[in-house]
């Protein structure tokens, strides 16, 4: 019988996606080289997979303070439309991995990819995530989860130390798309 410990948790699908065999979630892999952040609300970010792209959770007040308003910031509009092949100038839009049901992960889903044996968390340097995910900014990444106690805030995971916190939805953070569910 094969050694279960030797089985990989993550499978690179060869199409810019990674499947987590433990949770059955499929994740977007980022591209490029970690560098200076790019605020996609002030410039066009045509490559949604660029590791340096920052997005807003909501477009601003009053949407950010009303829990009943749907998320309408660049993370949920421009980013997801591009990942899902819905926003392009040519009319032939590639969707990621052949799927068009990508979304921003919940807090619980995003926390599943924090790896406390990697990067700063493991005593080294870099982000606390398995290198199989490709380049990752060691900073805050949005989840789709609103802070129930403070509706103007949403939950983020910081891959510099692996922790979660909530912050103002009008701020910018990084985003990694996911599909499926557990």
Predicted regions and their residues:
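Glycine-aromatic-enriched surface loops/turns that form tight recognition elements
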Residues: 1-103, 107-182
